[in-house]
Swiss-Prot record:
GO terms for cellular component: cytoplasm. Keywords: Cytoplasm, Methyltransferase, rRNA processing, S-adenosyl-L-methionine, Transferase. HAMAP family: 16SrRNA_methyltr_H. S-adenosyl-L-methionine binds at residues 35-37, 55, 82, 100, 107. This is Ribosomal RNA small subunit methyltransferase H. The gene is rsmH. One of its GO terms (biological process) is rRNA base methylation. It comes from Chlamydia abortus (strain DSM 27085 / S26/3) (Chlamydophila abortus). Its EC number is 2.1.1.199. It is found in: Cytoplasm. Specifically methylates the N4 position of cytidine in position 1402 (C1402) of 16S rRNA. InterPro entries: RsmH, SAM-dep_MeTrfase_MraW_recog, SAM-dependent_MTases_sf. It catalyses: cytidine(1402) in 16S rRNA + S-adenosyl-L-methionine = N(4)-methylcytidine(1402) in 16S rRNA + S-adenosyl-L-homocysteine + H(+). Pfam families: Methyltransf_5.
Length: 298
């Protein structure tokens, strides 16, 4: 996550401390956002001569370019997904790679992007890269009931996945689901009363599932993890920050398998989470989990 007036980068000090014993020269930030983590690394480590900053969100990348302008030619920007990056040849291997997964506060707060259930009259888009791909609204209208249920179950871990899918298919027969309000109406009777009384909005997991599917986040993450092992220099470190179990589980599993295979070692034997103080200042960071893997030296 990145720094703007409405957005605070998560676990910054913890990220920086993982390189305290190093003088990184080449760094890759595959989710630069508006540049919060990038600014911290470039300021803390003058040794970084090349910082590759990429993001699939063109709006975020534009903010990053403005925010990081003061670092001049130390920063190189790329509009790319993890999959796009995997196809491009690397000019050099990296001492550090950072990925801050999920949706940012910038994206949530911009209601026109459709990531938030607060923007009733806004379209259900949810694309990280608005230049390509299908929208969440299109997903809700083209997939069969069984397919929608699978998405809600696997990507959102929504207990009411079957009822939600059934309600949406029934609703779309008489009205197109275009806006956030439409989806709320379609699922109005799905959730049990105790879910409606909780602080967490009952549609949270449905929105999460749709976002993951629309942006192919599971596929993108798999590509990133596999590519990062090639991109890292010997002794290089990969930091992944995740915000839900569907993101954290594959990272945890991949790191374990990589360690067993002799590719390197897990530096975060115990996952790093935000302190109470950080959560107090930035409640949205409460579910963040940081894991770090070090590629073995030759």
């Amino acid at each position: 996550m990145s720094a703007t007036p409405s957005h605070i980068p998560v676990l910054v000090n913890e990220c920086l401390s993982l390189f305290a014993d190093r003088h990184p020269k080449f760094f890759c930030d595959v989710t630069v956002g508006a540049g919060g983590h990038a600014e911290a690394f470039l300021s803390a480590y003058p040794s970084i001569v090349s910082y590759d900053a990429s993001d699939r969100d063109v709006a975020a990348l534009s903010m990053a370019k403005e925010h990081l302008e003061k670092f001049g030619d130390r920063v190189h920007f790329h509009h790319a997904s993890f999959e796009d990056l995997s196809k491009d040849p690397r000019e050099h291997v990296y001492d550090g790679i950072l990925a801050d997964l999920g949706v940012s506060s910038m994206q949530l707060d911009n209601l026109s992007r459709g990531f938030s259930f607060q923007g009733d009259d806004h379209a259900l888009d949810m694309r990280m890269d608005v230049t390509k791909g299908i929208t969440a609204s299109e997903v809700l209208h083209t997939l069969r009931e069984e397919e929608l249920g699978k998405i809600f179950r696997e990507y959102g871990e929504e207990p009411q996945w079957k009822n939600a899918a059934k309600a949406i298919v029934h609703f779309r027969r008489r009205k197109k689901i275009v806006t956030v309000r439409d989806l709320k109406e379609a699922t109005a009777k799905v959730f049990p009363s105790y879910r409606l009384r909780k602080k967490i909005h009952p549609l949270t997991l449905i929105f999460q599932a749709l976002r993951v599917y629309v942006n192919q986040e599971d596929v993108q993450l798999k590509v990133l993890l596999e590519s990062a092992m090639r991109w890292l220099a010997p002794g290089g470190r990969l930091i992944i920050i995740s915000f839900c179990s569907s993101e954290d589980r594959p990272v945890k599993w991949f790191f374990r398998e990589a360690e067993k295979s002799g590719l390197g070692m897990i530096l975060t034997k115990k996952v790093i989470m935000p302190t109470y103080e950080e959560i107090r200042k930035n409640p949205r960071c409460r579910s963040a989990k940081l894991r770090c893997f070090e590629k073995k030296f030759l």
